[in-house]
């Protein structure tokens, strides 16, 4: 047991050493916060340790075959769990059918917990660590990914980075006036800054959800809502937001996810006087995510 732990530690340390300097440089460029970077590295080690033996073996294999996803035999299927099979267990039962279709990449459309009637098709996430109850549980997801892996099927999911649901724990605390959580979003107590953003930021849904801000009368603040009023934009200028979203990302990959489609990523960095689309900081954040994945879960494709 001790030898195995030392081997695992050495694998992690080797990967960390390979990326540490660039990762730290990029992190400090955005955040200038050494304590938060140290916390990030510590948590990366914890999530690596929580990764199952089978997933670690899968990582090692894919490190040796980094172009595993380039094969001409790769064939994917994208589906909504409820429409296809009712729930996660139903999808698991239909794996023989997927094999008959020669499917080796299964893209599950958003399945995390969302508020009923305000879900935006699953893209208004209320809890990044909970499956929507009618679809199953995290245990069901793990059982599905394990069975898929046994049948050489990769599992893909969407990771919503730009925003959370207004029902997310952070948003509820922010609505209650807790400054720590208000700083994780874009809150303004008057129209001055929102109006400046509106001059340069295009509208995503000008007909169904006009504008990029929503006024909350109970707090007396405007909150940035690029998509729908119930989807609050996260403030990636706050290192706590970046760190916590990375922890959510690593938690999900530890459930057996092979491929992560980052949703709405062009929007995640906001800068007054710009369109707030595809800014250079977005690419810095995605690069850091890729390096973190290569350290903790290199078998996962972004």
Where are each of the predicted segments found?
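Acidic/aromatic-lined carbohydrate-recognition and catalytic surfaces
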Residues: 1-237, 242, 254, 265-302
């Amino acid at each position: 047991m001790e030898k195995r732990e030392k081997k695992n530690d050495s694998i992690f340390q080797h990967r960390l050493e390979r990326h540490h300097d660039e990762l730290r440089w990029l992190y400090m460029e955005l955040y200038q916060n050494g304590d938060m970077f140290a916390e990030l590295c510590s948590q990366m080690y914890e999530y690596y340790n929580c990764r199952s033996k089978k997933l670690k073996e899968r990582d090692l294999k894919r490190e040796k075959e980094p172009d595993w996803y380039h094969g001409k035999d790769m064939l994917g299927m994208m589906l909504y769990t409820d429409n296809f099979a009712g729930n996660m267990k139903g999808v698991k039962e239909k794996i023989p059918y997927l094999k008959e279709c020669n499917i080796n990449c299964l893209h599950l459309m958003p399945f995390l917990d969302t508020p009923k009637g305000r879900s935006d098709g699953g893209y208004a996430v209320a809890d990044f660590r909970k499956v929507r109850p009618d679809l199953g549980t995290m245990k069901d997801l793990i059982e599905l990914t394990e069975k898929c892996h046994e049948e050489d099927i990769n599992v893909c999911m969407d990771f919503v980075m730009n925003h959370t649901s207004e029902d997310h724990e952070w948003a509820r605390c922010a609505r209650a006036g807790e400054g720590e959580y208000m700083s994780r979003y874009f809150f303004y107590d008057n129209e001055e800054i929102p109006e400046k953003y509106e001059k340069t930021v295009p509208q995503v849904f000008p007909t169904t959800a006009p504008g990029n801000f929503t006024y909350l009368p109970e707090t007396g603040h405007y909150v940035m809502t690029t998509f729908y009023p119930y989807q609050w934009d996260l403030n990636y200028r706050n290192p706590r937001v970046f760190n916590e979203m990375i922890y959510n990302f690593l938690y999900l990959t530890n459930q057996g996810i092979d491929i992560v489609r980052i949703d709405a990523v062009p929007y995640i960095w906001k800068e007054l006087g710009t369109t707030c689309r595809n800014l250079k900081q977005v690419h810095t954040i995605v690069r850091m995510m890729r390096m973190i994945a290569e350290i903790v879960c290199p078998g996962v494709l972004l």
